[in-house]
Structure formats: C-alpha cells, structure tokens
C-alpha cells in the first residue's frame, strides 16, 4: 500500500503518476531523491490533534519541499536555454527558492519582497547568497510585489528574451511536490485514525491548500480542510459574500500569510 512506503519512494510514485511520461522515470526518481533530503515528522499535540512539522528543510519553511523539487524540475527541462526565475515573497518563498536554485547553471533568480515587512532571519536567508540570486526590496506590500511579477509575465517579449519563469504557486511543479507531504502526514497516523482526517492549513495565497485538494482528489482519505487565515481575510469574505473585495494588506506576526 502507498501509505506504507518511505517518504521518498512514495513521493516518486505519486509524482510519477502525476507527471507521466513528461520525464524519464529514472530522472524523476533522482530528482525526488535529491529534493526530499529531510523529514516531515507528525507530532502528537493532544488526543486526536497532530501537527505536521514542515520546518526541517534548509530554510525552515514548508516551501523547501516545493522549491527544491521545482529547481530540480526546471534544471531537467530547460535544455540549453537560460531561465530567469522572477518571484515575489512575503518571506518563506524567497528563502526556499533562493537556496533551492543557488548555484544552478544558466538559471538566474530575481526576488521581490516588501521592505521592512519580513522577518530579519528570512531576509538574511535570501539576501546574503549573491551569485545567481538577486533581491530587490520594494517600498510597498507583498501584493504590490506580486503585481510587478504579473506585469512582467504579461510582457511577451520580456518572457521570451530572458526565459522568464515563476517560483510562486502558479508554477505547478511546486504544488505537485507539496502534495507529497499530505500523504506523509496521513501515513504517520495510526491506521485506525486514517479514515476521518480533517486538515487545517495556514493560508495566504492558498497554494498549500490547493496541494492538499490535489492529494484528496488523488484518493488520500481526507474528510475536509480548514483554511486558516489571519487578518488578511479576502478569501473567507469572498466565500461568505460572493464579492471579491481585497483590502489593504495588514502586517501581522504571521507575515508569510499577509496576502490580500
């Protein structure tokens, strides 16, 4: 059974099923092995409540899973062409992407982030590497950074000239990798508790939740999801009212979720 396999072997099978013949099996298996070099322990908090620890990667962020696999994937498919990764970050994406792509040949990374609105540790994690990693502090909030990224992707000539690509959650390779740790969470539960699982997901851009929904669609026995947000609650308000009405982003202690 899939849930009885170790993380890497299980993830190779999951991603192999999702990616199909787009990559040779041996190549994909090696990519997963190189990307998932750390664990995601499921720790019991109290009766029937568990926490999946996704901070054991090199930048202490859950996005290490997606970032490292995405770097492996782009390196495998780019051929002889050069790629420029342009991404906006509210903290954890920048660190994970910078470390995942650092030193990869013919891949440059440009990271936009809101000045003064991410933790000092996160800023040091991606602003001190140099090499093929470039960072730009924007005197605005995360949504303004994301708007600049979207504007760049709307420029067809720019996309073609520099081989523009994204490391945000619009890049499916990142989400596919994140699917794997939902399986890992359920696999670590006692067998008698695997049939009635409710997963609470901290949500900013809702990419992590999307990965969970993909896992459920693949057959993972998850009963339902809880999307946990902070004061930046555009999506919950939309689900209640049907009106899409983003507000000015509020700075909170959970800065990686500060997305309007």
State each model region's role.
Residues 1-260:
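PLP-dependent amino-acid enzyme catalytic core
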